[in-house]
Amino acid sequence: MAIRLPLICLLGSFMVVAIAADLTPERYWSTALPNTPIPNSLHNLLTFDFTDEKSTNVQVGKGGVNVNTHKGKTGSGTAVNVGKGGVRVDTGKGKPGGGTHVSVGSGKGHGGGVAVHTGKPGKRTDVGVGKGGVTVHTRHKGRPIYVGVKPGANPFVYNYAAKETQLHDDPNAALFFLEKDLVRGKEMNVRFNAEDGYGGKTAFLPRGEAETVPFGSEKFSETLKRFSVEAGSEEAEMMKKTIEECEARKVSGEEKYCATSLESMVDFSVSKLGKYHVRAVSTEVAKKNAPMQKYKIAAAGVKKLSDDKSVVCHKQKYPFAVFYCHKAMMTTVYAVPLEGENGMRAKAVAVCHKNTSAWNPNHLAFKVLKVKPGTVPVCHFLPETHVVWFSY
């Protein structure tokens, strides 16, 4: 009996692993965190277009209406766009990723809105020029489209050192403030959408797929080949910076982990906070990609959500969703209702760090707020795609 019992336990463990492997990321979340709703910011990243060759059409134009249907077959789909003075019909039949699409708008030539779309198996280029917008989309099988962002450090990494130019050029600078500023009626200039280099289009991979993708400096050249990224390019430098941050030493008192899937993020957070009394929250803004604007703290006032340990996960710049997660003690989490000057509303989440003595003295927060490490609590709003976990 003493021999059989460990064998039964071992078989049981294999069964649990096998069952977990068959779960979708969303189902895995609900199994691991039965009492914790998934935030919209994470739910929106559960779109598995990453390895699809299905047609995706985005049309931005004055008065435009877009209707897209994508059937289950690879490369299939129909898109109908009705805009000001124009009708566009796209059919995605043919070879995977192929097809020719013609759009006709009002007037003649490019000024009236003419777009030609050509696609080859695995690749696609869309160019649309019309009244109210110009769109250029290129697609390569296996990764989202890099739209351009200057490679730079994650300002939420504690050992990060900022350059003087970032005080004026980095929109993340506006996210930092002092805890004493969390009062009703306080005005702040903020922009909540974080730039990830891919126009916010990167999504989670299921863990089984994410684990097949090399992630680390030792196999970086292999990673670039996997995503068809040219070594030395701006995109490659951006990816390299993310990996360097994930591999960098942690500061005193910090526990950190880079999650390459939703499932691995859940596992890390559960290991630090437990599974039954945990919440995960993100900033929610009424309008996506809202510009920098002046907000004031609404009359409803600030609400303290947690005053203990928390796990904060920051979305990184990478071809698929990667989150830099770190557990920190002596942090306070707040819900901050904001009203913009143009009527825009936001349900912001703020994290205040009471002990910053181990942070890099040249961190962006200290330069913006003109304070020294370890002197006062330093706070920051979370961009829309970031999430904080805490016990209650």
UniProtKB/Swiss-Prot annotation:
Region (Disordered): 61-136
Stretches with biased composition (Gly residues): 94-114
Phenotype seen when the gene is deleted: Enhanced drought tolerance.
GO molecular function: mRNA binding
Pfam families: BURP
Keywords: Repeat, Signal, Stress response
Domain BURP: start-end pairs: 176-392
Induction entry: Up-regulated by dehydration, salt stress and abscisic acid (ABA). Not regulated by cold.
Tissue-by-tissue expression: Expressed in seed. Highest expression in leaves and guard cells.
Region (5 X approximate repeats) residue spans: 57-164
TXV repeat residues: 56-58, 78-80, 100-102, 125-127
Name the record gives this protein: BURP domain protein RD22
Organism of provenance: Arabidopsis thaliana
Source organism phylogeny: Eukaryota, Viridiplantae, Streptophyta, Embryophyta, Tracheophyta
